[in-house]
């Protein structure tokens, strides 16, 4: 017979206690004490500043107290494996800055059907050398795809979209990824919700508590002031800033699409609840949170509602909250703004905000350089990046899920005789293949017939000419297109920061025009580069004579060199050489007494180039060694020369 105290873990007799001592309660107690000490130490480090900023913004001590209580709850609920990972990353420092990091961005359904399907494809991702996977939006959205904005109209922040899987699937995928040294990134859409979100449905029903979480307005003069002062996000496809709701007789703010209601971060309940969503997702094993449209989150009448000081207050609080509960998690800011407006989102070295930012301007400037065969603006952009503190880390990319907006430095370009409107028109014509000599293919997005402004959509391979060469059956043109594609990836890998490849680019996948046959997608040309991953191409990756084999093999080799060579360290010294020929981009990286001369030819002509001095160099790609002062560089080619 078992004593009731024994069932509770209390020995029934001294003899039994001596025979079978229970150490588990003591172990649990010690583990709990250690966890308490870790949490309280982190909270003490940030509490005063966090409270100061919160009270400055909201002046609500009760809501701040609730927030702190919830931080403890989410910390307690954080799985032990993730807590251990947090501690390892705290000891290691900025893990995302390691030179061996390589990202890949993908849509779950296009790549593998479901989250479980992605788990089944991890061997392929490892083969690609991927250490960071950005899963495009997978949270629940309206079933009508024309109202989902590709996943950016979230209906439920704690539910995976049916058909893709479950939160349990996500947590399991994160666990399997961590076993392989792969981190997971997701989009945290914090500016707005879908109009089908519970908050929006209750607001539409007239519940004041939920109406206060959005911006409702009935005064036409106020709406007119917003229209006057705030730039439109989609002036042609979704003009205006408000959507009228006849059942309420009011307008609700919708800066993006009418079905995406802007959240009111003036309400502390909105901030708190969104932070709880953030921490819930972090506790599923997400390593990197991409803060979508973060510059837009604070609205103030009489301003342009972009990049306001309160935005930085919120991001700084998010950084501290994550460092208390889940310090292994990285904040990645999506700031599609002019360079002068991007850098402040790093915060300061003493009071950091985002860990990483998208290098949007450099991406757009790179493609402008391809079209113009002139690297001067790109040099200027890279020099500005090099002048920043080395702790500031950019996520570098050639293409992503989104369109390319030509947000270039037109103040500089106009000084060189390139005016904004005709230059943008030239770029869009060039990449559509409408300019003589262009082999690019793609489509315009959100074209404005009045101003002539538009954004551009295509895959990397199609922009480099792979699609056009394949359709023409032109082997010589294909050689040039593939050389250009490889050169651009070599340039990507030569930059400091975390390089990320869009899924399919490693196999030179071209545009997919089938979206035109889908009524729910036909009006959104961004789907031209959001096609399904073509698994039939993977079999050609081992064929060095195929386009896929040439790209895959080249990227595999370049990524391996980057992993092994210390000159690619994030803390290496980087200089942009002002070479006399504007078609040449020259990046010099130095570390540990070794120097890399990374040289790129953005032109259709072979170039004869001069080193700074005669010396002995090793070509890191071919392995050739020799002493020389001059060298030739074919059109759209590159060299990685190492000098010891």
Predicted region positions:
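Active-site and adjacent substrate-binding regions of carbohydrate-active enzymes
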Residues: 2-644
């Amino acid at each position: 017979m078992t004593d009731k105290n024994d069932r509770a873990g209390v020995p029934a007799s001294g003899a039994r206690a001596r025979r079978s001592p229970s150490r588990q309660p003591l172990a649990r107690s010690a583990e709990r004490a250690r966890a308490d000490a870790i949490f309280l130490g982190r909270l003490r480090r940030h509490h005063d500043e966090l409270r100061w900023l919160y009270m400055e913004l909201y002046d609500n001590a009760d809501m701040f107290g609730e927030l702190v209580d919830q931080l403890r709850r989410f910390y307690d609920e954080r799985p032990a494996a993730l807590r251990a990972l947090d501690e390892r990353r705290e000891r290691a420092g900025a893990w995302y800055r390691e030179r061996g990091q390589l990202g890949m961005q993908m849509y779950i359904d296009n790549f593998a059907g479901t989250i479980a399907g992605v788990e089944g494809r991890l061997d392929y991702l490892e083969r690609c050398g991927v250490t960071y996977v950005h899963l495009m939006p997978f949270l629940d959205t309206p079933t009508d795809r024309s109202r989902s904005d590709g996943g950016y109209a979230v209906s439920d922040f704690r539910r995976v979209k049916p058909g893709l899987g479950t939160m349990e699937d996500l947590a399991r995928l994160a666990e399997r990824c961590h076993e392989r040294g792969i981190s997971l990134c997701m989009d945290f859409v914090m500016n707005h919700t879908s109009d089908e979100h519970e908050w929006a449905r209750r607001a539409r029903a007239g519940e004041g508590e939920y109406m206060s979480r959005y911006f409702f307005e009935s005064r036409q003069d106020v709406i007119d002031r917003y229209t006057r002062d705030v730039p439109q996000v989609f002036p042609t496809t979704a003009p205006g800033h408000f959507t009228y709701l006849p059942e309420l007789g009011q307008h609700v703010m919708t800066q993006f699409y009418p079905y995406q209601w802007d959240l009111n971060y003036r309400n502390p309940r909105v901030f708190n609840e969104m932070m709880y969503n953030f921490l819930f997702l972090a506790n599923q094993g997400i390593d990197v949170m991409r803060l979508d449209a973060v510059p837009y989150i604070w609205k103030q009448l009489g301003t342009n509602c972009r990049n306001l000081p309160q935005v930085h207050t919120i991001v700084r609080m998010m950084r501290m909250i994550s460092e208390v509960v889940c310090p292994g998690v990285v904040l990645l800011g999506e700031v599609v703004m002019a360079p002068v407006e991007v850098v402040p989102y790093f915060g300061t070295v003493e009071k950091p905000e985002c860990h990483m930012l998208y290098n949007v301007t450099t991406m757009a400037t790179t493609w402008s350089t391809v079209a113009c065969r002139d690297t001067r603006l790109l040099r200027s952009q890279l020099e500005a990046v090099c002048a920043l503190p080395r702790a500031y880390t950019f996520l570098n990319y050639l293409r992503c899920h989104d369109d390319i907006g030509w947000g270039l430095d037109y103040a500089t370009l106009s000084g060189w005789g390139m005016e904004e409107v005709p230059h943008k028109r030239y770029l869009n014509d060039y990449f559509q293949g409408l300019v003589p000599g262009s082999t690019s293919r793609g489509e315009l997005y959100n074209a404005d017939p009045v101003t002539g402004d538009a954004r551009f959509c295509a895959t990397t391979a199609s922009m480099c000419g792979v699609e056009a060469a394949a359709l023409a059956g032109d082997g010589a043109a294909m050689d040039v297109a593939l050389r250009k594609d490889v050169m651009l990836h070599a340039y990507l890998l030569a930059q400091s920061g975390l390089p990320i490849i869009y899924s399919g680019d490693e196999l030179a996948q071209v545009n997919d025009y089938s979206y035109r046959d889908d009524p729910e997608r036909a009006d959104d040309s961004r789907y031209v580069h959001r096609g399904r991953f073509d698994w039939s191409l993977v079999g050609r990756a081992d064929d060095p004579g195929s386009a896929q084999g040439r790209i895959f093999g080249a990227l595999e080799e370049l990524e391996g060199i980057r992993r092994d060579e210390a000159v690619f360290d994030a803390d290496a010294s980087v200089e942009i050489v002002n070479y006399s020929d504007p078609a040449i981009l020259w990046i010099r990286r130095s570390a540990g007494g070794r120097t890399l001369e990374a040289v790129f030819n953005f032109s259709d002509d072979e170039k004869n180039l001069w080193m700074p001095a005669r010396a002995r160099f090793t070509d890191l790609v071919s392995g050739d060694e020799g002493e020389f002062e001059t060298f030739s560089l074919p059109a759209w080619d590159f060299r990685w020369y190492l000098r010891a």
